[in-house]
Amino acid sequence: MGHAIEEVALSRGHEVVGRIDKGQEVKISPLTDAVIDFSTPDSAYDNIRLALEGGFPVVSGTTGWTERMSEIREMVERQEGAFFYSSNFSVGVFLFRHLVREAAKLMNNLPQYSDVEMEEVHHIHKLDYPSGTALTVAGDILSEMDRYSDTKAYLGDDERPSVAKDQLLIHSLREGEVPGIHRVALGSAQDVIRLEHEAFGREGFAMGAVMATEFLQGKKGCFGMEDMLHFD
């Protein structure tokens, strides 16, 4: 992601004053106006914390660490900092989420459409599963459908697990160099409705991350895609 973000940033007239790769010590140039973090689940929290403690606005798209999000929010409030987080910076994914949420809202009043399942496909280098985007979309569904209150995930060719009536099943696949595919199936005994978003590359994610960085300038607090795009 770093190379894609750098290309987009340069194309929009920005200067990249530092690059930190995996295993390198985190040193942030005083010339920095914002830090963009796309790292790993085990390093993201410390990266974000160090940047915020240094007084730098932070944009993060790293997934798999958000059980500590409350600590980051408290730090942002305490230091009057700025933090923008999204599990997926694609504008198309945000549109997809909006469509899924509206479909779930409609189907909550149609008991025959009570069967919802999800599938996400990513490249073999993605360490966490289900994807952060899949969990976010699942949260959208849970917020609109009374039937569901929890999720259950399984990976690849593992045996399909049994699920409780209130559990939304997510199937995660890791294949080749797939940038990202998310599918939602809403079914009845008579038919099924499928919604899908497929990314063709990393450019859309990179553009969203740079847009978020631009949006964050001069602001204080915690923000997400809904704050920047105002689709609701």
List the predicted regions and their residue ranges:
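Short glycine-rich anion-binding loops that position phosphate/pyrophosphate groups of nucleotides
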Residues: 41-42, 64-65, 88-89, 175
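Short beta-strand and adjoining strand-loop segment in the mid-core
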Residues: 90-91, 104, 123-127
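Rossmann-fold NAD(P)-binding glycine/threonine-rich loop
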Residues: 46-49, 53, 62-86, 94-105
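Hydrophobic beta-strand scaffold residues
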Residues: 16, 58-59, 82-83
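C-terminal substrate-binding/catalytic lobe of Rossmann-fold NAD(P)-dependent oxidoreductases
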Residues: 2-32, 112-232
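Rossmann-like NAD(P)-binding element
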Residues: 29-46, 56-60
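Glycine-rich phosphate-binding loop at the start of an alpha helix
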Residues: 41, 45, 97, 203
